[in-house]
Amino acid sequence: MSSEAGKVIIKLPKTSIPYKYVEPTLIDVDKLVNHEELVEARLRELVDKIRSENAVDMPIIVTPIPGTDKFLIVDGHHRWAAVKALGYRKIPCVIIDYFSPEVKLKTWLPGIIGEVEPVLSEASRRGLKISMCNYDPNTLGEIDVKLLEESSFIVLGKNLCRAISGGIEGQKIVSQVLNELNMKGLFTLVYYGELSDALEDLKSGWLTYLFIRKILTKEDVMNYVKKGLVYAPKTTRHILPFYPAKTYTPLSKLA
């Protein structure tokens, strides 16, 4: 094994987003819609935490889904799922205006420190087409929009460019492959919040391969969840004007 099994690095720029107290609104868990698949280990961790604290430490962030009586979970998928798994009817929420310019939407960009061939081989085995492309970190701004739209990811490395087919649905397959091979210790998995940071590490050689994808719009997200669909974990990265301060809502209020 070339790296520590399950090692994941998160790389985000430093920010100064403030914490703000907002009186939470209790919303029925069945009125809430998640937009990303859940990670079972994280869900189990939060179930145990909520049970031991006998409270939900902080509200989740939600926004109305236009044309429905439901709310999109912007941040807090696993807390919502944990409360639901524990059998409670309501969860503390902070409702935001999703389309406010203060709420920004970006995407997580996966990268690996290690060999990419096992990822490409397994993605191909699971039905995705791998094709050659001619981009490098210095020509990234010139990538064809149509190619990004049709690809699940474009993989860049030193002297390598591969487009993986599948679009949004293909991203679920690739993300699953990345997680599975990472757990086997084949490589270290790195998630970047900003493309510029990822490219810097790729050019320096610290990062071996970078997976880039189309950046979603807020309209994309809303339309996708209205179809009853969910993205792969760590697809969307929402930047909010504030973090909700902890309120420790007792479970007794959620029955």
From Swiss-Prot:
The active site is at residue 36. GO terms for cellular component: chromosome. Keywords: ATP-binding, Kinase, Magnesium, Metal-binding, Nucleotide-binding, Transferase. Mg(2+) binds at residue 75. O-phospho-L-serine binds at residues 74, 76-78, 108, 234, 236, 238. Its EC number is 2.7.1.225. Its cofactor is Mg(2+). GO terms for biological process: chromosome segregation; positive regulation of sporulation resulting in formation of a cellular spore. SUPFAM superfamilies: ParB/Sulfiredoxin. One of its GO terms (molecular function) is metal ion binding. It catalyses: L-serine + ATP = O-phospho-L-serine + ADP + H(+). The keyword S-adenosyl-L-methionine does not apply. Belongs to the SerK family. PANTHER family: CHROMOSOME-PARTITIONING PROTEIN PARB-RELATED. Free serine kinase that uses ATP to phosphorylate L-serine to yield O-phospho-L-serine and ADP. This is ATP-dependent L-serine kinase.
